[in-house]
Amino acid sequence: ICGAENNPNSLSCTNCGAPLTAGGAQPFNPFFNAGEAGNPFLYGVTIDPESEIDGAKVKDIACTVQSASARYIPKFKAMADDKKKITFNWAAFFFSPYWLFFRKLWKAGLIFMGLMLAVALPLTSKVEALTTAYQAYSEAIYTSSQADITAAFQNVATAMVPVLPMLGIQLVLHTIVGFIANPLYKRSVVAKVKKLRAEYPDDRAFEAATMRKGGTSILLAFTGYIGYYIVYNLLLYLVEMLIK
């Protein structure tokens, strides 16, 4: 594929890493793209791998982003060229702060988690009051008079009033994250590429470093998910103890 000569007994190309058949023939490699053989993260990327985005080469960004690089690199390029200053990340909108941890934006993830906790704690008692009022209303439908049903429904409406603004705040927070996610991720990736390139000028060493420090982390996302509920319940317990 890359044109390099290999030992007939080699199982893979010593230059690009492509698998070799027993006869030494080099089968078609779908990841081969514009001279960047052996880089699967460039698959689907239509931008020149040697071109730059804010001073970082596209091929290096692909190695650092890894998962879904074909989706993010065009967004990064458009933002860098001022073709599309405003973008929206639906995954970040629905799944933050866990998306932030998944993409190794752990500092932003911690900040967003703190904001969500600040909203969730006072919201808990309001939701509990709304749940209690709704349960009473549901029971009244089958067991009480029309007057009692009307009174129970009014209690539900009253309990819902303080919940709506807090839900609105949560929606605003998620919307903000949706808008800042792609620019934040681009800045993080470009900074990481430049830092790793300075430390590892050799391509092989750089690629090995990005496998460790780039990409995504399901473990970090899961840890963030568990950590959120541990901190939430701990703070809720402390608040209840202070009230008592």
Label the predicted regions.
Residues 10-13, 107-108, 182, 186:
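Internal amphipathic alpha-helical segments of the cytochrome P450 catalytic fold
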